[in-house]
Swiss-Prot record:
Belongs to the ATPase alpha/beta chains family. It comes from Prochlorococcus marinus (strain MIT 9313). It holds the Pfam family ATP-synt_ab_N. One of its GO terms (molecular function) is ADP binding. The record marks 363 as: Required for activity. The gene is atpA. It catalyses: ATP + H2O + 4 H(+)(in) = ADP + phosphate + 5 H(+)(out). It is an enzyme of class 7 (translocase). It is a peripheral membrane protein. This is ATP synthase subunit alpha. Produces ATP from ADP in the presence of a proton gradient across the membrane. The alpha chain is a regulatory subunit. Its EC number is 7.1.2.2. ATP binds at residues 170-177. F-type ATPases have 2 components, CF(1) - the catalytic core - and CF(0) - the membrane proton channel. CF(1) has five subunits: alpha(3), beta(3), gamma(1), delta(1), epsilon(1). CF(0) has four main subunits: a(1), b(1), b'(1) and c(9-12).
């Protein structure tokens, strides 16, 4: 017979009571009412915040965007194939954020900061909110330092400064991305962190950009954020904000950064798709009413910070694709009004062989002039005006039979200037080379060079200066001015190259 020992029973009960954990885990949970087209309608989630991350049963994440009386509209950031009506949804209590660290340089990441280049995890100890407030007025400083693109026509006529927002706008296949990639390549050795955001592009195009940057040695200081055409609309909408957050993390550490949004037209289309599926009222061109705010809050994050804030900067080059050159459409006019100038690329100029196909007449930089280096400012002051006058004269000369000598001379110089400004892709020029080319054209030193040999002259002049006159290159690159000594060397070099070319012709 088993003997009952009361002391043992009481000891076990005391042990059980002491180990009892009465804490209750409370989580904000809802139920899926409807799912489809990347949108979920969820009942419950009473305590959810606007923009909060929610987690579905199958592990898919979403963002709560519409907080209505009886349900919550959430956009999915994944396929969501395992989600069905009645599935549970859990609020995470977190707003969308992205991990940031120096280890991101040279990597390709998703809009949530996850690596997608097969090189393993990215170690990081801190994260930044994807949506954060732009620096205030007191935290800023006026744009005063140049950001050289390496493209002569831009650096001489439409200069860009650190902290500026300069729009690149044009039809498809006019070289918009090429200008952006050239600008990244030209930052080599300049201690500028670059972020390239690809929105709604073909995965093959993004892979091509990565390969070009790797070949040119530019991937080491570049982060690529990719949301390709096959990704959900929510990720395409988030990608530019992720790019801005990554750039901000470097900017607030006192570094100069450059962000390229390629392109914001596709981001607006992804946002339109989400808004219409969430049953928000459509406005002009079926875009929602807050599509202006979509872009303004993104581009306002670009800034040149004050000395007290560490003097960092974030320069933004948003890209917009137009339809048949129509810059008066809704999204182009919105972004033109937000940015500090635009570089307009024309398909007619592109097809006529002018690359980069920049329409100088309607391209403008509203603040970059203050940041332009003295060397190029001194000689390029009249360049834009001369080219604009040449365009007018060229149009007029088509109808005139006999032109006077002065007009013919002006037309000849205009044509040579046009030829000088042609530049191959992925071959940015340094400041000294740009100064030499523009000087030769503006001062009329190549008026005797045959028009079809101007490109050859430009190439030979650059080679001659590098091999025979390195002191000129060093002087202009370090001092950023074209003083009398440098000008004398340059003039002699131009005449030398010109003489040898004309003699061999």
């Amino acid at each position: 017979m088993v003997s009952i020992r009361p002391d043992e029973i009481s000891a076990i009960l005391k042990q059980q009571i002491s180990d009892y954990d009465k804490s209750v885990s409370v989580s904000n949970v809802g139920t899926v009412l409807q799912i489809g087209d990347g949108i979920a309608r969820v009942y419950g989630l009473e305590q959810v915040m606007a923009g909060e991350l929610v987690e579905f049963e199958d592990g898919t994440e979403g963002i709560a965007l519409n907080l209505e009386d009886d349900n919550v509209g959430a956009v999915l950031m994944g396929e969501g194939v395992g989600i069905q009506e009645g599935s549970t949804v859990k609020a995470t209590g977190k707003i969308a954020s992205v991990p940031v660290s120096d280890e991101m340089l040279g990597r390709v990441v998703t809009p949530l900061g996850q690596p997608m280049d097969g090189k393993g995890d990215i170690p990081s100890t801190e994260s930044r909110l994807i949506e954060s407030i732009a620096p205030g007025i007191i935290k800023r400083k006026s744009v005063h330092e140049p950001l050289q693109t390496g493209i002569t026509s831009i650096d001489s006529m439409i200069p860009i400064g650190r902290g500026q927002r300069e729009l690149i706008i044009g039809d498809r296949q006019t070289g918009k991305t090429a200008i952006a990639i050239d600008t990244i390549i030209n930052q080599k050795g300049e201690d500028v962190v670059c972020v390239y955001v690809a929105v709604g592009q073909k995965a093959a195009s993004v892979a091509n950009v990565v390969e070009v940057l790797r070949e040119k040695g530019a991937l080491d200081y570049t982060v690529i954020v990719a949301a390709s055409a096959s990704d959900p609309a929510a990720l395409q909408y988030l990608a530019p904000y992720t790019g801005a957050a990554i750039a901000e993390s470097f900017m607030y550490k006192g570094k100069a950064t450059l962000v390229i949004y390629d392109d914001l037209t596709k981001q607006a289309q992804a946002y339109r798709q989400m808004s219409l599926l969430l049953r928000r009222p459509p406005g002009r061109e079926a875009y929602p009413g807050d599509v202006f705010y979509l872009h303004s809050r993104l581009l306002e994050r670009a800034a040149k910070l004050s000395d007290a804030m560490g003097s960092g900067s974030m320069t933004a080059l948003p890209i917009i694709e137009t339809q048949a050159g129509d810059v008066s459409a809704y999204i182009p006019t919105n972004v033109i009004s937000i940015t500090d100038g635009q570089i307009f690329l024309s398909s007619d100029l592109f097809n006529s062989g002018l690359r980069p196909a920049i329409n100088v007449g309607i391209s403008v930089s509203r603040v970059g002039g203050a940041a332009q280096t003295k060397a190029i400012k001194k000689i390029a002051g009249t360049l834009k005006l001369e080219l604009a006058q040449f365009d007018e004269l060229a149009a007029f000369s088509q109808f005139a039979s006999d032109l006077d000598e002065a007009t013919q001379k002006q037309l000849g110089r205009g044509k040579r200037l046009r030829e000088l400004l042609k530049q191959p892709q992925f071959a940015p020029l340094n400041l000294a080379e740009q100064v030499a080319i523009v000087y030769a054209g503006v001062k009329g030193l190549i008026d005797e060079v045959p028009e079809d040999q101007v490109t050859q002259f430009s190439r030979e002049l650059r080679d001659y200066l590098k091999t025979n006159k390195p002191e000129y290159i060093t002087k202009v690159q370090t001092e950023k001015v074209l003083n009398e000594d440098a000008e004398t060397i340059l003039k002699a070099a131009i005449n030398e190259v010109k003489s040898s070319m004309l003699a061999s012709a």
